[in-house]
Amino acid sequence: VLSPADKTNVKAAWGKVGAHAGDYGAEALERMFLSFPTTKTYFPHFDLSHGSAZVKGHGKKVAKALTBAVZHLDDMPNALSALSBLHAHKLRVBPVBFKLLNHCLLVTLAABFPSZFTPAVHASVDKFLASVSTVLTSKYR
């Protein structure tokens, strides 16, 4: 459960990402594909090279989902319900892969916002991403 301080930190951190959220989403995906090659299996039809249009496009989708979650911190299950259905029933993404992407998102934010990404912000964003993962995997059962 996110505390009021966590919610403030998450909103502030995501506010820094702002209009470039898709770029950061793509950067995190690239990190994930490089660091955890097994995650590429969900994207056999994508050009996964650096800067590809497909990775950028999916980065925008990831960023939009996270923006929706930030805007609905008190009701993420409803805000992400359709996305949860998609990942559980159609795409069948391994729940572990959400944790891998979360790690890459944290690294991306830390690398791009070193002075703003304090230990407290890191902890809050980590809790937020874990909450998003829990919601996205809730329909796997």
Curated annotation (Swiss-Prot):
Pfam families reported for this sequence: Globin
Quaternary structure and partners: Heterotetramer of two alpha chains and two beta chains.
SUPFAM superfamilies: Globin-like
Keyword Heme: yes
Gene3D superfamilies: Globins
GO MF annotation, one: iron ion binding
Domain Globin positions: 1-141
Protein name, UniProt field: Hemoglobin subunit alpha-3
Signal peptide: none
